[in-house]
């Protein structure tokens, strides 16, 4: 983990938003990117934590509907990043992340949202210290074996169950 990742099998002609992940990741790596999120709302939490661990400023625009998901994903994504030592600013329809090379780590909360929990795992890869996640069981909604897969790849994250 922590190596360069290549996403294969994504059809560039597909109507699925996932096809845009290559361009978004390339823009984040270049630094100072603006990424329209209207067609890729489910990717924003993961892309935002990648941006938090990459030097430069990344602005996600047209993402207001993220406030109406399992959690207010604009607010919970920023809270996750801030809990791990990153920074940014949330707007009504946007999220701006001020990336740096590494995050220190810390204790964060999934807020019961599977995408926030999985994004915490991604963020942990750019942390110099340990990460503890509250509500890790949120991944059960979409990928029950997520933590086993993450650990099998060498990922390390501690978790606390929600009360």
Language-model segments: what does each one mean?
Residues 1-163:
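Short, structured segments at the rim of ligand-binding sites
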């Amino acid at each position: 983990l922590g190596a360069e990742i290549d996403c294969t099998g994504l059809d560039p002609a597909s109507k699925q938003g996932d096809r845009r992940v290559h361009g978004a990741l390339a823009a984040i790596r270049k630094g100072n990117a603006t990424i329209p999120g209207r067609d890729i709302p489910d990717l924003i939490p993961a892309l935002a934590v990648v941006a938090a661990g990459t030097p430069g400023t990344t602005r996600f625009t047209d993402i207001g509907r993220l406030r109406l998901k399992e959690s207010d994903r604009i607010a919970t994504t920023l809270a996750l990043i801030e809990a791990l030592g990153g920074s940014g600013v949330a707007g009504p329809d946007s999220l701006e992340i001020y990336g740096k090379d590494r995050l220190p780590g810390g204790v964060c909360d999934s807020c019961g949202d599977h995408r926030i929990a999985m994004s915490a795992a991604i963020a942990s890869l750019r942390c110099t210290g340990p990460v503890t996640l509250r509500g890790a069981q949120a991944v059960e909604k979409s990928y029950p074996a997520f933590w086993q897969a993450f650990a099998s790849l060498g990922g390390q994250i501690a978790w606390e169950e929600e009360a």
